[in-house]
């Protein structure tokens, strides 16, 4: 599914990234593969954003992360910032699957 279609209505995706073909959604960086959308879920013990670079190195094409995450992070892929990562994760998964 195209990134723009997957996020439509919830996340503003820059036009140059809207045509990225997402083949998998992952919140575990160790499971990311080529074509993944990595969702950096903040947690109590650790923060998913700490693992975004690993997900990208494994082939993730974009990252969904909390507001402010893009500042100071140049992962080489779009970082789509959202207010509530867990809420968006459910919506994205529902639309994708």
Language-model features, listed with the residues they occupy:
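N-terminal leader/targeting and accessory segments in enzymes
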Residues: 1-91
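Walker A (P-loop) phosphate-binding motif
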Residues: 91-97
């Amino acid at each position: 599914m195209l990134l723009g279609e997957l996020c439509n209505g919830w996340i503003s995706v820059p036009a140059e990234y809207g045509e990225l073909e997402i083949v998998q959604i992952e919140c575990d960086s160790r499971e990311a593969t080529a074509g993944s959308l990595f969702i950096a879920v903040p947690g109590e013990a650790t923060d998913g954003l700490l693992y975004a670079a690993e997900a990208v190195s494994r082939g993730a094409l974009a990252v969904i992360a909390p507001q402010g995450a893009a500042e100071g992070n140049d992962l080489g892929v779009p970082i789509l910032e959202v207010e509530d990562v867990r809420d968006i994760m459910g919506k994205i998964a529902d639309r994708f699957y």
